[in-house]
From Swiss-Prot:
Name recorded for this polypeptide: DExH-box ATP-dependent RNA helicase DExH2
Gene Ontology biological-process entries: DNA metabolic process
Family of the protein in this entry: Belongs to the DExH box helicase family.
Swiss-Prot/TrEMBL keywords: ATP-binding, DNA-binding, Helicase, Hydrolase, Nucleotide-binding, Nucleus, Repeat, RNA-binding
All copies of domain R3H, residue ranges: 15-78
Lineage: Eukaryota, Viridiplantae, Streptophyta, Embryophyta, Tracheophyta
Name of the gene this protein is made from: NIH
PANTHER family referenced in this protein's UniProt entry, alphabetically: ATP-DEPENDENT RNA HELICASE, DEXH-BOX ATP-DEPENDENT RNA HELICASE DEXH2
Motif (PH1): 1349-1360
Length: 1576
């Protein structure tokens, strides 16, 4: 322990080594070298320092050798060159192809796969434990079954979707934006403007004062020189010190010159690196010209602008101008621009550097264009050389002298009672005339012994410049003169105020040597003693510094030292504002808190403490420019934003922490870094210059002189320390045929090759570039939108699944600060975490992104009720960020509309905005490939840890909702996150969201398939898998004889191993992975279609596929939530912030059910969400409210148990309204059947209307007076749906909707003779149970259908209706309700004679568990339907509404026996009069119910067909033979709980959240082999 303490002390003392090592490491990281070896012999302690620094900076370090030969080596990433990685990859690929049994990749294209960034080729090692099984939920299987029956896989699925055959779009398409066009101004208009300006100058006193102040700026005397240089040269560089006035005056000089001298209109574009600068400067210039913003001067920043074409001067950010140059095309954007001013080029942001490269290439072909570069640092020569030696106009700054102290001096100041360090801050400037006077006084004193003048000057100046001034001719100083002349008192005085006794004259002698030469022994002795004291003091200062450095960490800001220094300044001086430079918001908050806790600064009348940060509202930021009242000192705590972007003119004292938060990118490890780093010398100079605005100032640099000497000259250019994926895309848009790497080498400082390679991989992953690096139409569209390319893809996907609003929120939030604030006290932190969890729980919890979406929705609702401030306070949310997000979302939506991506009315674009499954999928698209999986828990770990694709282990941030996912059910859960950040606290991920597996399979880059151990007879489940690190690049199935993968896909139920992105293994059935592949292809095809044709409908097969994808995502989320739902304790006091009522339900599932028994459990939860502030559910929920009827949300999963008492209350529950696949709004089932709406589908792009295909030709519904529901409870009447003629059914099975579980049987009905349909299968519509009503499918528009309100009716009049080809279906006399409970009988209909229906299979419900049987039904002959693609069993005609067929059978409540009702007369197919069908009863029995077989009938008279079975029987209902008298009632069987029901929730069957119109078959598995193209 003692040794460790000694080493630590030594490490802290050796600051010189730390400063030197920091410089070496930073230079190495900025270089293009892959390795570096220290040639110096380092001690163990020094090597320890460097090893620790390397870990922080993401570098690898290793020591080799022994003794004097021991050397320390540094490496970037894994130390393996890219060429070696490529050879390793090819060798591994060849090995895999030759004999490891891996089938080739399911991807048809060659992807350039991202390799492990910190370990070369990833050696995927599958855990010996069983693979995680992945399967579609039963409801999703039914949807997929319907999809692939109607639109089976074919070659057209991949046509146009392969990245290799994308067509390059017109990258120079016209973008109609006249903001950068030259104003329409005649010479007369220009003269009027000049006269108006002159008139105001004469008449308005305020305007004259402004003009006079402008004329006193340092740059005013250089006006003519600047104008002349601009007229004579195409490029001019103005190097002006901060405060000279270049930013505000140069644009006005150019404007006035064009108007006054040339009488010409002009368009002057001025770029700024920051939004705040562009807006504030344009506002300042407008004020100086006596105008309002938006007239002569305007601005345009991202999603915000003032002014337009008539603005002659436009301020914008660098990114805006860059987008204009690229987006509009170089041939159409430049001619209207006369001048481009690029300000603050020394900041070297990536957009600025890239734009300068483009402009340099444009200048030769645009001789009219003038480019003015402006910089505030000494790096002007380099920029001049970059533009071929352009002229430089140097403008001095208008600042007073500033004295600088370093940490060594500051510590001495704090230990001293004197205030001599403040003397220079109260004296006037040392000017040229003072220098002339001193020259004369020194000459007179030395030659004529006239000392009075020199003594007076030195005393009056009182500055170090005067004390140490050297004569311009002789080099003598006042101290030398007084020492050589023996003036002891003057020598003592000069030495006491800091005169330097080490200076030498031009003859090379010091004051001491001159005194000895002149035999002035007394003064010589005084100087000799003083020099000894200085050395002693210097040693004391060094000792003091060493002791201080031993107690702190140099990389951390010492807030306590800053407070002590401010107290010292305020005690020794009376006025002058103090500006403190700090790295970030955390340090600002800590400093402010410490100041307020100190009694010295607690008096608000004496001190005003202000913060200058991007998180601070604009109104608060403006206060820093106001001068405080007399007797009050202003203290400003700021980041580097105060270096050059803003100027505070009353600052006298500057405290520089020497640190700055800088975001950078490590391309070798593919990790972003946000660390506090040391400033550059240029930054330090800028900060010191802030102190000399109004008088002489002082700057305290809180780092040593040794550290100051080791600082880099300038900051590393942003293009070298940030990802360049956006720049690479812009390069391809500018020149589609160029090589990106070669193009970027033209930059002043090009990025490293590894960074460019990483960017190209991302662009290929999202489809913006082909594998050959060609620009795709998808990439062209991504580049036009004002968001990151990944965000662009997320927006397009969100539009396709009707989930736009959350996507806009997430897109805008990606570039903003976290809306959730971080309280300082532990108690408040716990409350903030609970509040965030409560918001996220509205969408299933375990997501930081969904918490942001919920917070924004709740805030908008609270804002509408005037409670936004209270809501933000109680939920620890930044109202500033919320307002900002609201503004950005509105503007981004306008931009999308302007680009034609969405229609002007986008109210229907967010019908699925509250579906958790679809929301998580949208997040996955926007964040991919930032994917990881949760590591299993360990005893010593308290925080969640994520494993990335590179094999790195990163932590979840402390404020994340997923920080403490301690349950083992989250082991290996998949996580998507914003980015990996290496900070001072370690390597963490940013905001993250837990994902189900199916979205990952859908959106991943590639999926590879191999056999599982269970398929191999040699291996067991417990054996380790073979390596899957590198698989083939084609998605073809290996069919060579003898190969292990020969029969992978031949059996649909065979289990296969699927490896996602070459590192995530899962176990899936061969049939389901085949379906997944087709869905992937159709998803990409849908996005491409939407990009090319944003205002057109998707083709039918793509529309149906997007609907199916949305349904799968929704059902999968419901299945996941039923397993992983975690109760969140509500914050009662917080809830009141948005809803002061007392009836707000808790988030506890049981309480939700008790709150409203008539809603689905998730419906109650969404009701809670609505009351908490989720806005108008009628506008956003996928299921709509029709005619004022309330309706529970069908898009959510039941998550609570439904008690028997609750079920009894639901005798007649509200039916659900659902959108069908083909955009038909089925309306409310119980009421209001008159007006049927056609709404945009939840799966198709907004604005596309698509109606249901007609299933019957010339359907005539006849005059139907009463159409009661198809499934009636409590004795309600019911009619039979129409059949359709000439329908191509394809290979359709008859799928009943209910699920038979726990040993339920369904016996085979007897077949009818001579029945042959050609393997045709029929799908029976699903029904509503538990007293839910279902209206007739063919009900006429406007007809009242209130059968549910007539439980006492026994009989109703028969109705005559027509079916396909005007066929009379005869009379149906008796129609029993479809859902009969408690041993009600029901018979089957007789089949008609001579109908050739072929082999038609009747499939039992979707999930047949425990030996459920599946039977075959033969239907009458001579009615050949052919292959029908449209398999929807429910028809809509003449505006008839259709009940929701996706409603699953629920547990029936106890109901009284129902009497028989008269059935209706209906027509069948092919002109056959089916006669009187007496009894129509349900077709399916659930929970142990038996169904008897119908007797076979030969050549039955179609005139009297009896009993057509609509749907279901539940809860012990029997079904007798359809062709005999009702059978004897069997004993009532005890109902069993279905296996597939959630054991915790014990609820109704889950409903889809995408308005799913699914078939009754829930299995989703086609019994035949999957129809997959041979090339798949």
């Amino acid at each position: 322990m003692a040794k460790k303490k000694k080493d630590t002390k030594h490490t802290r003392l050796c600051e010189a080594t730390g400063a030197w090592a920091t410089k070496v490491l930073e230079d190495f990281r900025a270089s293009g070298n892959d390795s570096y070896v220290f040639e110096q012999q380092l001690t163990n302690s020094e090597r320890g320092i460097i090893h620790q620094m390397c870990r922080t900076m993401g570098l690898r370090s290793k020591s080799n050798g022994s003794g004097e030969e021991r050397r320390l080596s540094l490496f970037k990433g894994d130390g393996i060159s890219k060429s070696d990685k490529r050879r390793m990859y090819e060798a591994r690929n060849q090995k895999e192809k030759e004999g490891d049994g891996i089938s080739k990749s399911y991807s048809k294209h060659r992807y350039e796969t991202r390799f492990q960034k910190a370990g070369g080729i990833r050696k995927t090692r599958i855990s010996p434990k069983k693979l995680k099984c992945v399967s579609f939920p039963p409801e999703a299987k039914a949807v997929l079954h319907d999809l692939f029956t109607r639109y089976p896989p074919c070659d057209g699925d991949t046509t146009g979707t392969s990245l290799g055959i994308y067509t390059t779009g017109n990258v120079n398409s016209n973008w109609k934006d006249d903001f950068f066009k030259k104003p329409h101004m005649t010479k007369h208009d220009i003269e009027n403007n000049v006269v108006s300006l002159s008139s105001r100058l004469k008449k308005e006193r305020h305007f004259r004062e402004i003009f006079e102040a402008r004329s006193k700026l340092p740059i005013a005397s250089f006006r003519d020189a600047i104008i002349s240089a601009v007229e004579s040269n195409q490029v001019v560089l103005i190097a002006g010190e901060t405060g000279c006035g270049k930013t505000t005056q140069v644009p006005q000089y150019l404007l006035d010159h064009m108007w006054h001298s040339k009488k010409e209109a002009c368009k002057i574009i001025c770029t700024q690196p920051r939004r705040i600068s562009a807006i504030s400067v344009s506002d300042r210039i407008s004020w100086e010209r006596g105008e309002t913003i938006g007239r002569t001067v305007g601005y345009k920043v991202r999603l915000q602008s003032e002014g337009g074409r008539e603005s002659s001067v436009v301020f914008c950010t660098n990114g805006i101008l860059l987008r204009v140059l690229i987006g509009k095309g170089v041939n159409s954007s430049v001619p209207d621009i006369t001048h481009i001013i690029v300000d603050e080029i020394h900041e070297r942001d990536s957009y600025s550097d890239f734009m300068l490269m483009i402009l340099r290439d444009l200048l030769p072909s645009n001789p009219h264009l003038r480019l003015i570069l402006m910089s505030a640092t000494l790096d002007a020569e380099r920029f001049s050389e970059y533009f071929g030696g352009c002229p430089v106009v140097r403008v001095p700054g208008f600042t007073y002298p500033v004295r600088t102290f370093f940490l060594d001096d500051a510590l001495s100041v704090l230990n001293s009672d004197k205030n001599s360090h403040l003397l220079s801050a109260v004296k006037r400037d040392f000017k040229d005339e003072d220098k002339v006077s001193l020259d004369e006084a020194i000459d007179l004193a030395w030659t004529n012994d006239e000392f009075d003048c020199l003594v007076d000057l030195v005393s009056s100046e009182g500055s170090h410049e005067a004390y140490n001034y050297q004569n311009s001719t002789t080099g003598l100083t006042p101290l030398m003169v007084f020492a050589g002349k023996g003036r002891v008192s003057d020598v003592c005085k000069l030495l006491s105020v800091g005169a330097d006794c080490t200076l030498k004259s031009k003859e090379g002698i010091t004051a001491l040597e001159l005194a000895e030469k002149e035999n002035q022994f007394e003064t010589a002795q005084i100087i000799r003693e003083h020099a000894g004291n200085i050395q002693s003091n210097s040693q004391q200062a060094q000792d003091l510094l060493d002791k201080y450095m031993a107690t702190i960490k140099p990389e951390e800001v010492d807030v306590g030292l800053i407070v002590k220094l401010m107290k010292k300044i305020c005690s020794d001086s009376k006025d002058g504002a103090i500006l403190v430079f700090l790295p970030g918001w955390e340090e600002i908050s800590k400093t402010k808190e410490k100041l307020l806790d100190d009694r010295f600064f607690a008096h608000s009348a004496k001190f005003i403490i202000l913060c200058l940060h991007s998180r601070v509202p604009a109104e608060e930021q403006k206060k820093v420019f106001n001068r405080p009242p007399r007797g009050c000192r202003k203290i400003v705590l700021a980041t580097n934003i105060a270096e050059s972007a803003v100027t505070i003119d009353d600052v006298v004292y500057v405290i520089d922490s020497g640190r700055m938060k800088e975001k950078s990118y490590d391309p070798y490890n593919d990790v972003s870094t946000l660390q506090s780093s040391w400033v550059s010398k240029a930054n330090a100079k800028q900060r010191a210059g802030r102190a000399g605005r109004c008088q002489a100032g002082i700057c305290y640099h809180l780092y040593s002189k040794l550290r100051a000497a080791s600082l880099p000259e300038y900051r590393v250019p942003e293009v070298m320390r940030m990802p360049v994926d956006e720049l690479c895309l812009q390069v391809k848009m500018l020149d589609p045929n160029c090589n990106v790497n070669d193009f970027l080498q033209k930059l002043m400082d090009p990025p490293v090759a590894q960074s460019i390679e990483n960017a190209l991989i991302i662009l290929k992953d999202i489809g913006a570039l082909t594998p050959e690096e060609e620009l795709t139409e998808l990439g062209q569209k991504f580049g036009q939108l004002p968001v990151h390319p990944r965000i662009s893809k997320m927006i397009y996907f969100a539009i396709l699944v009707n989930c736009l609003d959350p996507a806009l929120i997430l897109a805008c939030a990606a570039d903003e600060k976290d809306p959730f604030t971080m309280p300082l006290s532990p108690g408040d932190r716990k409350k903030a975490a609970a509040a965030k969890h409560e918001l996220a729980s509205l969408y299933g919890d375990h997501s930081d992104h969904l918490a942001t979406v919920a917070a924004f929705q709740c805030w908008k609702n609270a804002k509408a009720s005037g409670q936004a401030k209270e809501f933000c306070s109680k939920y620890f949310i930044s109202q500033v960020v919320m307002k900002r997000l609201d503004d950005l979302c509105r503007k981004l939506q306008g931009e999308l509309n302007r680009h034609g991506v969405i229609p002007s009315s986008s109210s229907n674009c967010s019908l699925n905005a509250h579906d958790p499954g679809i929301l998580r999928a949208v997040i996955a698209v926007g964040l991919y490939p930032m994917l990881g999986r949760m590591c299993p828990l360990s005893k010593n770990r308290t925080r969640s840890v994520i494993e990335t694709i590179a094999g790195a282990k990163v932590r979840v941030p402390s404020l994340s909702n997923n920080v403490d996912m301690s349950s083992t059910k989250f082991d290996e859960a998949l996580i998507v996150f914003d980015e990996i950040t290496r900070g001072d606290w370690g390597v963490v991920i940013r905001s993250c969201t837990v994902l189900p597996t199916i979205p990952v399979l859908l959106f991943s880059r590639e999926i590879a398939v191999s056999t599982t151990e269970s398929y191999d007879a040699v291996k067991s489940d417990d054996e380790e898998d073979h390596k899957v690190g590198n698989v083939g690049d084609a998605m073809d199935i290996d069919k060579e004889v003898g190969r292990p993968g020969e029969k992978i896909m031949l059996g649909p139920e065979n289990s296969v191993k699927v490896v996602v992105d070459r590192w995530l293994p899962f176990k899936v059935t061969a049939f389901e992975i085949a379906q997944m592949y087709i869905l992937r292809e159709r998803l990409m095809a849908s996005i491409l279609f939407k990009v090319k044709h944003p205002k057109e409908n998707l083709p039918p097969h793509l529309g149906a596929s997007m609907y199916a994808i949305a349904s799968v995502l929704s059902y999968d989320s419901l299945a996941q939530s039923s397993v992983q739902t975690v109760a969140v304790q509500p914050i009662t006091s917080v809830v009141d912030a948005t809803s002061p009522r007392d009836d707000i339900p808790s988030t506890n599932p049981n309480e939700l059910r008790e709150h409203d028994p008539n809603t689905t459990p998730m419906g109650s939860k969404l009701e809670l969400a609505n009351k908490l502030g989720l806005g108008n559910m009628e506008e956003s929920l996928p299921s709509n409210f029709a005619d004022g009827n309330e309706q529970p949300d069908p898009n959510t999963s039941p998550v609570e148990d439904v008690s028997a008492a609750t079920k009894q209350k639901k005798m007649q529950s509200e039916s659900k309204r659902c959108k069908s696949l083909n955009n038909v709004d089925l309306g409310n089932i119980e009421e209001n059947f008159g007006n049927m709406e056609e709404n945009p589908p939840s799966d198709l792009a907004i604005g596309n209307e698509q109606t249901l295909p007609k299933l019957a030709s010339n359907l005539d519904m006849g005059n139907m007076e009463e159409n009661t529901p198809s499934d009636l409870a409590n004795g309600n009447e019911k009619t039979e749906p129409n059949s359709a003629n000439s329908m191509d059914l394809g290979n359709m099975e008859e799928n009943t909707p209910s699920d038979l579980a726990n040993g339920n049987k369904k016996k085979e009905p007897k077949s009818v003779s001579k029945l042959d349909l050609g393997s045709e299968k029929v799908s029976i519509p699903s029904n509503l149970v538990n007293g839910n009503e279902q209206h007739d499918l063919n009900i006429a528009p406007g007809e009242d259908a209130s059968a549910a309100k007539q439980p006492e009716k026994k009989r109703s009049r028969s109705k005559k209706r027509k079916s396909g080809n005007n066929l009379d279906l005869g009379k149906m006399e008796k129609s029993k309700p479809s859902d009969l409970a408690n041993e009600n009988e029901q018979t089957e209909p007789k089949s008609a004679n001579n109908l050739d229906l072929g082999n038609m299979k009747e499939n039992t419900p979707s999930d047949l568990a425990n030996e459920n049987e599946q039977t075959e039904l033969r239907l009458p002959n001579n009615s050949d339907y052919g292959n029908m693609e449209e398999s929807l069993p429910l028809n809509l005609a003449n505006g008839d509404e259709q009940p929701d067929p996706t409603t699953a059978p629920m547990e029936a409540a106890k109901q009284p026996k129902k009497k028989r009702s008269r059935s209706k007369k209906c027509k069948s197919v092919n002109n056959l009069d089916l006669g009187n069908m007496e009894e129509n009863k349900p077709s399916d029995l659930a929970n142990g119910n038996e169904q008897k077989d119908p007797e076979s009938v030969n050549r039955l008279d179609p005139g009297k067909e009896k009993e057509s079975i609509p749907s279901n029987l539940v809860s012990g209902n029997e079904q007798p033979d359809s062709n005999t008298a009702p059978a004897k009632k069997p004993k009532k069987k005890k109902r069993k709980l279905a296996n597939n029901f959630d054991s915790v929730n014990n609820m109704e069957e889950k409903m889809p959240s995408t308005n799913v119109l699914s078939q009754g078959n829930k299995s989703g598995l086609i019994e035949e082999k999957p129809s997959i193209p041979s090339d798949q």
